[in-house]
């Protein structure tokens, strides 16, 4: 019993290496003192604003975000968290996109970021602007009224309301606009005041229809416009490669290199889906003969497969072998659940030697842009915390392997050491169980006394005798099942082909046999009376 207790103690100690201490979630516990310096991630802010604008694209915050992107401004009223605050504090706080903001900046919050929100002074609500537009257009037909006959995606309320009030600033319905654009407010002094508080200058040349005009050499297609085109593409085909790339770039808060919006747009419009409506501006601007320098600076991803090539690769892999991720792309054509680039990449990171992964190997070449970018961990080299163990049917070293269960994957040296000792002691337990069964079988061996006590049944069919059914048969069956389970479990561990885990099994069996093997030669004591 002391030996068994000791083994159980060591197994518990080994398993405890997997416990990880959690951290305070400042979104749900914003009053916790440790949350003072918490910063709500930019990727989450962008996702929340996109959530709001996906539901109501005519909201003022959508226009403000686009204008700030065009001016490449991220401070003051253009700070993304301040833009989110414009909606969640004053306009549409009940929308789902505001859920995290409201929790983070709830009453009693100690998060300093909440006190730095630079909301637009006297910004009218969406419905107040809409009401003023309808009132103005009912009194007088003006340019812009045709865009807001109904409140939908074509009715950009802030732009239309500002256009009407710039034309007729003394109208009573423009009182809200006058307050918003007052010289003492932060809108008038911001980089986005042009077109909202002051007339926007008209460009001398239309570089979309005349991209070969010398004056278009320095023309820059704004990030906001490029993002709008990408959104157009992804609304039609959300499984496209560019949609995944944009998500990854947003998560890393990267807007340069392959993550530049114009470069992401180029990935689709130059190589993948040039015929889609979202590529019309790109194709005009970068047509043959264009002098626009931005077109020559597109940093497209080298050897990026097309959406349909990726899907074909996924189908071929999953037809040969069922792997994690295949269930997302089970149909005969891509769907919204089939995010082809991440799925294809995860399959190839797990089985890089498959022939279907030739495109992935080229795309993730160490000399390519994707491999050397900030988003490489999503598609080429996953971090240890997120990496999928590679199935290698040959002896190998390393710590990243599945051990019996999908959730048992050591990702640190400490976790791997704990796994090694857990397997080692389990192998010792296996030898102990075999020894215990051997001892019991010898103690239960029928003898002369059993025959005299009628504990044996004579059988002409078997030409001998056998014991009656007793509780011993139940114990024998249970011990046999335990022994079989242990032996198969250890066999499966050895079949990971991980050298260290293989020798954990061998070492455990060796030590267990040394400790308990001799007891298998146990002979029950025989007295004179037996």
UniProtKB/Swiss-Prot annotation:
The keyword Transmembrane helix applies. Keywords: Endocytosis, Endosome, Membrane, Phagocytosis, Signal, Transmembrane, Transmembrane helix. One of its GO terms (biological process) is phagocytosis. The chain crosses the membrane at residues 491-511. PANTHER family: COPPER TRANSPORT PROTEIN-RELATED, SOLUTE CARRIER FAMILY 31 COPPER TRANSPORTERS. It is a single-pass membrane protein. One of its GO terms (cellular component) is late endosome membrane. One of its GO terms (molecular function) is copper ion transmembrane transporter activity. This is Protein P80. Belongs to the SLC31A transporter family. It is found in: Late endosome membrane. The gene is p80. Residues 1-22 form the signal peptide. The keyword Signal applies. The cytoplasmic domain (residues 431-481) is responsible for the endocytosis and localization of the protein to endocytic compartments.
């Amino acid at each position: 019993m002391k030996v068994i207790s000791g083994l159980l103690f060591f197994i518990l100690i080994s398993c405890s290496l997997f416990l990880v201490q959690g951290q305070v979630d400042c979104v749900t516990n914003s009053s916790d003192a440790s949350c003072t310096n918490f910063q709500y991630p930019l990727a989450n802010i962008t996702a929340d604003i996109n959530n709001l604008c996906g539901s109501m694209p005519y909201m003022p915050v959508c226009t403000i975000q686009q204008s700030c992107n065009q001016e490449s401004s991220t401070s003051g009223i253009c700070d993304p968290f301040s833009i989110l605050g414009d909606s969640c504090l004053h306009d549409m706080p009940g929308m789902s996109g505001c859920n995290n903001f409201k929790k983070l900046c709830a009453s009693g919050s100690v998060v300093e970021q909440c006190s730095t929100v630079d909301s637009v002074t006297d910004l009218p609500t969406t419905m107040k602007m809409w009401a003023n537009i309808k009132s103005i257009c009912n009194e007088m037909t003006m340019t812009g009224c045709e865009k807001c006959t109904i409140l939908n995606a074509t009715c950009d309320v802030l732009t239309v309301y500002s256009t009407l009030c710039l034309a007729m600033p003394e109208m009573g319905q423009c009182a809200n606009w006058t307050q918003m654009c007052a010289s003492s407010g932060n809108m008038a002094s911001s980089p986005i005041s042009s077109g909202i508080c002051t007339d926007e200058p008209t460009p001398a040349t239309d570089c979309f229809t005349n991209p070969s005009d010398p004056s278009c050499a320095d023309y820059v297609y704004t990030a906001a416009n490029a993002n709008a085109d990408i959104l157009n593409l992804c609304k039609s085909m959300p499984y496209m490669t560019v949609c995944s790339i944009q998500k990854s770039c947003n998560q890393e808060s990267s807007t340069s290199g392959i993550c530049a919006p114009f470069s992401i747009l180029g990935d689709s419009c130059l190589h993948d889906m040039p015929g889609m409506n979202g590529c019309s501006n790109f194709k005009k601007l970068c047509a043959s003969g264009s002098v626009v320098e931005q077109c020559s600076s597109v940093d497209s991803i080298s050897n990026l497969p097309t959406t349909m090539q990726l899907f074909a690769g996924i189908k071929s892999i999953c037809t040969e072998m069922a792997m994690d991720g295949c269930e997302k792309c089970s149909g005969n054509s891509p769907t919204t659940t089939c995010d082809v680039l991440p799925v294809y990449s995860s399959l190839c990171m797990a089985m890089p030697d498959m022939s279907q992964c030739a495109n992935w190997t080229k795309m993730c070449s160490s000399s390519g842009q994707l491999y050397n970018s900030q988003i490489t961990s999503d598609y080429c080299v996953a971090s240890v915390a997120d990496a999928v163990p590679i199935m290698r049917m040959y002896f190998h070293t390393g710590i990243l392997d599945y051990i019996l269960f999908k959730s048992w994957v050591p990702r640190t040296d400490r976790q791997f050491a704990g796994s090694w000792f857990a397997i080692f002691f389990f192998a010792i337990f296996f030898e102990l169980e075999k020894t215990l069964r051997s001892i019991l079988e010898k103690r239960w061996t029928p003898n002369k006394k059993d025959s005299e006590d009628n504990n044996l049944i004579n059988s002409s069919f078997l030409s001998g005798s056998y014991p009656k059914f007793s509780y011993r048969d139940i114990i024998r069956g249970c011990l046999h099942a335990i022994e079989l389970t242990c032996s198969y479990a250890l066999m499966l561990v050895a079949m990971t082909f991980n050298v260290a885990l293989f020798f954990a099994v061998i070492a455990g069996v060796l030590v267990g046999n040394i400790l308990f093997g001799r007891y298998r030669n146990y002979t029950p004591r025989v007295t004179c009376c037996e």
